[in-house]
């Protein structure tokens, strides 16, 4: 109750009536005057002034000038009397008894001087709040009224107990604020809602029930005389806030019978409600248990809502259901008598509805600040802020805030029509009385009922009465039918009754009675519909139970088709179908009952069935949203009058969906009111009423108990655009429920606010960019990585993540009806499953790596990767395909296009597989961690420690990666789910998704790319090598990542102890280089300055690329050789050529390997350079590779050319100027760092005496370990080479290594398997163009070396730019078949050097000895090394892995090697360069003993004995191959194949590394046997690796390139290391292999690594003294002048090997594909 302008209590709103012919007297208290509001002379209600219940009078009778006439008599008077007669007002409706109605207030006489002449609004218009200015007068204090009396509800403590209440159910609303019917089931619990949050409950529809209403007498109220002490100031004004009810949902009126619009108590103590601030009141029907959310602390007057704005919070006056509904304030219920002809009361509630967006909103918004700006800001004194914090705010800001909250709402009558549930027509009351009489005629009542319902207007109460009468008639007929003895009469009477009932039901469903249904609240609508259905069913079974023979009774009316069928069981031969096509043309619905179900429910040989089909019932039986999709109710809430917070204004455009009944209702029953369960389900075919914008069909039945639709027992068999087929296991009323999507579709982004939308775009974009960078890194820098299973796994993970991010970005932009919505959901489902599967396989791969030999190997495991691909994508696609087959609509039913509908299929095909993969990944990660910790404590090899460290890092990164990805998509899922349910925490999940998704992209880039040192260097080099990048970026020192460590000393260890640190000298030049460049380089060498030697020391200047002349034609090694413009490097310097730049530097204690990148080839070229002699090693175990060149061998100091060696120069001088010749091939030189003994495997930087700098991580180098050396692994290719004519026979034995592995069968099997894998890999990986170019470089270098030796020993080498070299290069380029099929290291073949080239047939191994016209060797073989990746560290093995004594004994093994040395001493051209450790000079008796052992071997077998032809070295080669030999060869081939298969099947013990087996098992008897057979077929020499004598004679100084083994532990051999280990009794001693085995210049090629020790012993035993002597004599004869020197040098070398190791010369090249080609110089003797 508000105060008037003088501070008194606001006047009370009162109503007075006077019947026609009576006096209307209006009287106020003394001092008060009458203020009329409205008046009417006529009739608006049938109950007022109608003592006899006449229902024929008009209830729409009004005299327009009633208020004018009454004002002239009573306005501003203390009392007045007016005669209610036509003489005074006229006769607006003749024949109708009229009455005079007046609405007025008694106002104070003082108040009339300050008020306008406008009638005051009803009392619910007035509001209370802080002081306001009214009409320019002084400040007025308005005390708040008491809140309306409300029914007490569960969970509500009094009036002020709960701040806010959130409901959980609601019904949908149309765009015009219509509230479709719907029933809520269950009790809703009230929960507390924090201010500012968004409700996530569903307010129920208005629950209006029948209430007994009475009107209390109007008691005039005397206004209070209390007023403010200071009317001009607000300082002492107490203005507590008033809690008003602003609800979006209507509710029942007060249950205590008080009319809220006519009865109110004055508030005589305004201050008592001050504590009611921030309180809320819920309102609703007590019977339903529903609660309605209310709004806190809306102070309208404080908001500036003055008299001009009050109309915005009132529902306008209107006519509805023959009643006039006056202006009503929001939140109040207008109650008045029912229309004429009906008894009871009608009610209608005024609520706030969210307005529809239109162009008028802007104007409305613009007006709000203007209205609020007119309100001045009062001062706040006293304790106002204590009781009401909101009153402390300035009124202007408060007004603006309220206006912002109210701008999208408008007052609306709710529901669409008044609630006339309590209005009942008088004539139905009489029918109800008749049906309850004992002797009443039921058929007569039924006919009268059908007649009245078809002609009279019904109200809501009439619907309840009608269905009740139908129920009562069926119950009475059940008893009365027994009084009819005649069966036919009984059937006729019941049939007549049924006809009347069916007709009445059809009338109730008719369109003309739709308003009568809308008069009922939703719960009553469902109750009436249930009563109608059961009444029809009961009456139908009355007839069915009466019929005793087979019969079919059909009752067809406008809206109902009823069929009663009584069938004999013996006549039922199939299913029973209802209805027939000619009986019910309104619909094509059909129900089919199987024969089995009918027979099970028969009685007395008869089956009684009742079928019914209804029209228009679907418009009555609305779905109940608590049973089905809550989205519909949520959509209703978003568009109804829930005034909650400021964010509600933005929810008007949310996606709207509503659940509707989209088919006719069809019914079948086998028992009255029984839900009979059937053993065989029935089939229903239902036609869709609406085909556009509908989805998600659901088969439902009407539950009589719950008065709601239920899907229990029914399932959807199939559906299309127009029909759905259902299957149910019981009988009742059936229909189809479907989702109706609003035509105005919105994507997922419509629910994002502006900031979140931008952040999601940024987050996804960042993640996508980093994923693409990671993929490009794996592709462009593939040479940096091992082509292993892990690389393939991470590539697949990145691809899946990229697909997920892009599909998510596309999906949130799509609407539900978009054609791409379903496709996006399907592919997103598949991508997520595949991604989680790859994470599982990554964890499994780590586990399998730790539990197998794969720990020390990083090779491409193609079968395992293919299995991963099959399981990942195959399983994912299978699961998605099954999901599509089961229910394709699952991908289109959800609100958003990035999720499946949350049903059983979603959990079984999406959630379950993801959880399985996730749990498996976590399990394997945990197991891997346990195994890794065990191995880290037991691992002995440095290589294994390194791999364990790498695996440990991979496991950590993968685990963090998996957790991060899980958090990202869990946040995304919870955000979408929370946004769908309007949860308050949804934005939190959204921003978490944004943050973690961005972090995921950064994590991928940092931990999978940046943390890798090799990739960092590749990035820097990529920047430096691309001209389109800025020069400042390319010139950065940080972009230079690789080089060669060099120093001012010679190659090797420093000469003195003063050289404690390595130095680096640098100079640079551009290609082509002229003659003057050599001098400039020399000057630069003289002026070198010292720089500390480090891992990544750079020979080239930091800004070398900045000086690159871009216009200069790019030159390579090839062009430099052709033009002769290569710059000679200083003595002892190392040359690095990178693209068009070429730099030189001095070698220090060691060299770090340069690295390569895609698109570049790095060459270290040692052309025409002499090396300084290496000083004696200062510490044992330190052996270094140094730069070989041609001139250091061609022109040795002191004239000792033939015996000069970098490492052995001093040795030659000590023996009187006689030394072993060691050829120096001018190949590209590649250096790896080696280190001496170190503790704990730590790197030691710097140089100096006894120190070797470690090479950078990722290069091919040896890790720091005890006596670690560089280890190279030879690999072999089977190629089609150029075959020559048959040369003179020259046989040489196969040299075995110093030590063989013990287990011959095991190694043979393992190595054969390795060869098979290598062949498969070679077939898959062809030589790239860069490899072919590198092949040309290698061939060209060898041609240069051979050409220098053509003229003899003393001739200087011709310049490299001679025309002959160019012709040879062109000839080589023209031979495409040779280049494409031949190894790049097959340099022993003749290439135009006067050699007759002939194309042979079949396959030959690449490094065979070449043939020429005059005999001799065309050049020693050069070996290549193909490593899978630079990331692979060098392997180290324990000496205990090999058992010397089991393989060789001292008498045989040492003698054999001594025989070789004797042969070398006799003829260096054959064995010169073979540096074999251990033993002494072999005596002739030993040779004879070996020859005798050799002669004892069988003459011919399919094993190694096939090589008996090699024993007779002096015999002439026989070109003829007999047929018996050919047959023998074929038989042996078959046996070999079978032997290979058997070997593969043996389960032999595992070995740590296959590469070690490849290294140690060098000789392969099987290969030798097959090679000789192939030679016989091709007419070639039977000697394995035989070459022409003329070549050896032409190049007597050449010793074939060899490999050697030195353990670095004294003797320089593996045997010596093994002996030291046995002596020291140290089983943990490590042995590093850095030296392979040698052969002569015309010796055989290095065989594949699959020969067993037994086969090698057999081959060694075949050596006879005669063959050895003859071969030695032959070699001595070709070079007789050097024979004695060889013997002497050989003996001296054996003595020196006991003291120190020899330095080796290694030539190598690394191309962009990380193929390393190694060339070793001959061993010093």
Curated annotation (Swiss-Prot):
Keywords: Cell membrane, Disulfide bond, G-protein coupled receptor, Glycoprotein, Lectin, Membrane, Phosphoprotein, Receptor, Transducer, Transmembrane, Transmembrane helix. InterPro entries: GAIN_B, GAIN_dom_N, GAIN_dom_sf, GPCR_2-like_7TM, GPCR_2_extracell_dom_sf, GPCR_2_secretin-like, GPS, Lectin_gal-bd_dom. Residues 699-744 are annotated as: GPS. Residues 1505-1522, 1532-1543 have a biased composition (Acidic residues). The record marks 731-732 as: Cleavage. Pfam families: 7tm_2 (PF00002), GAIN (PF16489), GPS (PF01825), SUEL_Lectin (PF02140). The chain crosses the membrane at residues 758-778, 792-812, 819-839, 866-886, 911-931, 959-979, 987-1007. Residues 551-744 form the GAIN-B domain. Residues 779-791, 840-865, 932-958, 1008-1725 are cytoplasmic. Forms a heterodimer, consisting of a large extracellular region non-covalently linked to a seven-transmembrane moiety. This is Latrophilin Cirl. It comes from Drosophila mojavensis (Fruit fly).
